[in-house]
Amino acid sequence: MLDFLELEETVGRAWHRLIGKTGSWPQYPDHAVQLVDIRQRLAICFRGFGGDIAVQIAPARARTSTHRLGLRQRMALGEEKLAQPLRDEATLMLPPEIALFPDRQLNYDLYVWLVGYMAVMPMDADALPEDALRRDLAALQIAEQTVERACRAFPGLKPRYKRLCAAILAERPKRPLHRLEQQVEARILSLLKQGADLPDDALPTIFPHRGPAGYLPALPVPLWPGLMKREEVAPRTGEDEPVRNSQSEGAETGRQIAQRERQDPRHADRSPFILNRFEKILAMAEMVSVDRPSDDSDEQNAKSADELDDLTLGERKGRPAARFRFDLDLPPEAVDRSLLTAELTYPEWDYRKGAYLPDHCAVLAAPVQEKEKPLELDAAAQSLVRRVRRQFEILRPGREVLRAQLDGTDLDLDAVVRSRCDLAAGGQGSDRVHLMSRPQANDLAVTLLVDVSLSTDAWVDNRRVLDVEKEALLVLANGIAACGDRCSILTFTSRRRSWVRVETVKDFDESFGPTVEHRIAALKPGFYTRMGAAMRHATAKLAEQPNRKKLLLLLTDGKPNDVDHYEGRFALEDSRRAAGEVRAKGVNVFAVTVDREASAYLPALFGRGGYALVANLAKLPVAMPAIYRMLAG
């Protein structure tokens, strides 16, 4: 009753009511559609629309829009952030939530339209002009042409687009603009009316060659995604030092646009006696961490960095106090196309050129160093090993009996009777009257290829990923030994294309025993995951085996990546190509992953039915034998 006497609270509530909700577009939270709920469906739609299979869908980050603000917006923050849909060669960046219309179906239709639009968006378009006016007009021209192309290619989208245009016209804000800005806005409204099949009485406008001073871009239209062209950056030459397990790791955020830091040779040799003017130190609005070799930033910097429109990714020496997780969209690094000279080299697929890069990766093959003590298993794991061995012993081939043989340990009575009858009838008897038994041949050779990259050093549900992988590997290896299948175990990690290390835990002709168990216990985290080269090397060894059936079973915990150009779509396309090469050699390939987000990219790599996702890390030792039994038949 006396709340009005609290002046600060009263003024605060009044101010919040005045400018608390100043967004240009209305929001209807009760009818919102979340990207995370329909991402798989949209990915299928994108493939169906003819989109590239290795292109990923990621949430777009809200970025500052430079359109003209209303009075209340200027009184509030003085800026507006919009999660505008964007596309580059590797990613579709869609708003994490759409609540633009008071109709949930319309919000869902907008997602479907954006995916169809991006599927036919021209990726070879020229960069937009620097001038703001010319950039707006060029973007509108591209949007008009792309809409026409999408509606012509997919007639079923046209009624959807018509409804969306009508809804956008009803929701688009009307605000005072400068004369030239108003003319651009009229052009936007004309295109929307054209899409909604509404009459348009706007007259053609002749725009100047350049926008005048003070011209601000138009408010973006959610129906028309933008194209992000990223130029290649020079490859890095310095040694990479990945950070080992830190104290904390933040939660994942949306796709953050980032660029690599330009290398300044003066930073290589910095003297503490060189004076620096304070004016050179940048504010937090421009960068999170000042380039200093010893001090670490506070964890609050994660939140500050998350609010930036653009991040610059640099390399610093030393161990950070904390780790922050960002989903970065980096410009592609230029590919070093020089040939490598090594004992084992393999090609790599460059999807941009549509050709292989010969002798591009050097594989260093070596045995795993043994550990003095084997892996210690708890009572539950030991019980699982015994149970799996019993289950797999049933799969061990029995002995087959061959009838009507020239020699053997017993007589084939049917053959003897038949031979005597032939002689009694005046015919010629047969000497093939013996039985011979022999063990059935094992017709399967399998290679277990295990990812031991740095990410396996992470902890999930109070257990280290690599420790669980070791346990699962030990359980499965015991089972394979019990059923008698020929098996090899390889691990892989990488650090640039010149250092792809593949280590042998067990070879085909080696029996499973304490030595192999010690090697499994000795596995430790490496660096990065150059999956394509590792798969090609493992397949080359597997293809040499005489068995009729061959299986490459890959165990991994994340996307393929490396410290050089091998990341994003390049890595996905090369890994997908490598999987196709494996199958072309008559080898079945199957991937098992513990990455909970793997459903966004594994179907593109291994196809439908070519992978299994074990979301609960603790269940991996139980799941691996079951998966193997399914694959082994």
Curated annotation (Swiss-Prot):
The keyword Protein transport does not apply. It holds the Pfam family VWA. Residues 445-633 form the VWFA domain. CDD domains: vWA_norD_type. Residues 232-270, 290-314 are annotated as: Disordered. InterPro entries: NorD/CobT (IPR051928), VWF_A (IPR002035), vWFA_dom_sf (IPR036465). Keywords: Virulence. SMART domains: VWA. Residues 232-243, 258-270, 292-306 have a biased composition (Basic and acidic residues). Part of the operon norEFCBQD encoding nitric oxide reductase. Essential virulence factor, probably involved in the detoxification of nitric oxide (NO) produced in the macrophages during the innate response against infection. This is Protein NorD. The gene is norD.
